Amino acid sequence: MTTLTEVLDYKVADLSLAEWGRKEIDVAEKEMPGLMATRRKYAGQYPLKGARIAGSLHMTIQTAVLIETLVELGAEVRWASCNIFSTQDHAAAAIAKSGVPVFAWKGETLEEYWWCTRQILEFEGGKGPNLIVDDGGDATLMIILGYKIENNPELLEKAPANLEEKALYQQFREVFAEDSQRWHKVAAEMKGVSEETTTGVHRLYQMMEKGELLFPAINVNDSVTKSKFDNLYGCRESLADGIKRATDVMVAGKVVVVLGYGDVGKGSARSMRAYGARVIVTEIDPICALQAAMEGYEVSTMDEAVKEGNIFVTTTGNKDVITLEHMKQMKDEAIVCNIGHFDNEIQVEQLYAYAGATRLNIKPQVDKYTFENGNCIYLLAEGRLVNLGCATGHPSFVMSNSFTNQTLAQIELWTKDYAVGVYRLPKELDEEVARLHLEQLGVKLTRLSDEQAAYIGVPLDGPYKPEHYRY
């Protein structure tokens, strides 16, 4: 157990992987023009000088390029992954060897995961971060919930709702025993958080509505150059990559059930259809359901689709969308996976506890569950992100969009004073992120004349669309 006065340099799987990681980071930099342009733009200016940034985001090669961008802009950075399976160990090793404290390895336990999250919130001299780069909201949650517990220590005695909560509360007990005001001190120095993903944004808005949010937040997820690119085009490529690396299955001719038709669901459905699958979509939202139908997908309920599907993909950000009863009804050899942020989209804990199923591990992140009737299913990445648990996540180019937004959000929070609330980056920055990625694709923009700009009522150099425009 570490104490608040013992600040560790790093904890990774194997530091000898650093050279391999560095080679891949060098390759990724060429595919991440937005981040590299941001480095050039602010060279010598250090807009993040003095900032202590805690990062809770998948420790991949692409994230390594983000980390080193933040460091070049002047920040002191500590990093952990936001998922127990998503770390690329050679990326973590390279970052650790560069001198950035990183606490991440592929295959963490829940106890280790929350220990790692705690480490990124503990800087030298007993200080906490003043900025967070978050993905899913766990680092933010640790501060907010820790603050709440310090106001009402009886919360430490409540029975945990699940294994995740049990592991988290163990960290809270250790911190509280050392310093009963630790999280109040951390919160007091916080300038803000930039949140990467849909699930984390939902958490932020819920905290705001309840009056629990303690510092400003920028919703990076809903920047157009994030949600319409990372969520859509990234998933379109990385979902199939994860499924195929895990199972070697032929997708063509299969029935794939995609649960949810938001941006992630849209990308996932397109991916599976492109491989020749017949895709069934489930939806709660009539607008998204109509979109799916107009794209030619069958739209049904899970209770009906469960009997037809060969592959099931959850994309909703909600819990219990695939239940234990659903899994018991699936066809023999069905594949079950998730590309939403948390594993509770699938009732994984209920499956673990079910005496009528036997588990056989096929290989890392691929488990076969056989039920009493002889049918089996394959659960990928224990219900966590299949594209990162079973493959390497989204390609570098699309992550450059997202991470350029993250970098700009960190600069925005550090250099300006925001009131507590949830904000989005301005439209002109969204357009700038897109512009930084055009040259690499050989794109040539048409330019308005003065008369044309005046005619449609937009500035000559943008922004070209109103805030309410839906791309």
UniProtKB/Swiss-Prot annotation:
UniProt keyword NAD present: yes
EC numbers for this chain: 3.13.2.1
CDD domains tied to this protein: SAHH (cd00401)
Enzyme kind, highest EC tier: hydrolase
The keyword Metal-binding appears for this protein: no
Binding site for substrate: 60, 135, 196, 226, 230
Cofactor(s) annotated in UniProt: NAD(+)
One cellular-component annotation, GO: cytosol
Residues at which NAD(+) binds: 197-199, 231, 260-265, 283, 318, 339-341, 387
Co-factor note (free text): Binds 1 NAD(+) per subunit.
Keywords: Cytoplasm, Hydrolase, NAD, One-carbon metabolism
GO-annotated molecular function: adenosylhomocysteinase activity
Family: Belongs to the adenosylhomocysteinase family.
PANTHER family: ADENOSYLHOMOCYSTEINASE
Protein name: Adenosylhomocysteinase
Species of provenance: Pelodictyon phaeoclathratiforme (strain DSM 5477 / BU-1)
